[in-house]
């Protein structure tokens, strides 16, 4: 397993290659058939690049070396630096989850029963839309499989 410092170095290299490509996550997503959030997860080593997707990613970002593509295909250590929560955007996402969390849970339970929304088999995307007054608005779509809690019997 790679150390967190080597993960950090790899992520820095991947983000530099992405920056040099001049492409956004959304542009890369359109070229690869992935969501923009998943592409960002790949470059941040929070997701595993499937071998069958590697060629599309290489075509979208030609400067990705074979070594970088191979590293992206290793199963990642899905972790985060605890100080990342101090970033205002991430903090506001956390704040929204805390503020709406119990209400969202209640609605999930009413609509589906006793269970959770999985982050496995999960799709996420971020979209930019115009609001009613012409202002830019952020739409985050979180699409997770419902997993019912099961009764544990012998």
From Swiss-Prot:
Keyword vocabulary terms for this entry: Lyase
Protein's recorded name: Cyanate hydratase
One GO MF term: DNA binding
Family indicated by similarity: Belongs to the cyanase family.
Reaction(s) catalysed by this chain's protein: cyanate + hydrogencarbonate + 3 H(+) = NH4(+) + 2 CO2
Naturally occurring in which organism (per UniProt): Physcomitrium patens
Positions of the catalytic residues: 92, 95, 118
Pfam family, one: Cyanate_lyase
GO term, biological process aspect, one: cyanate metabolic process
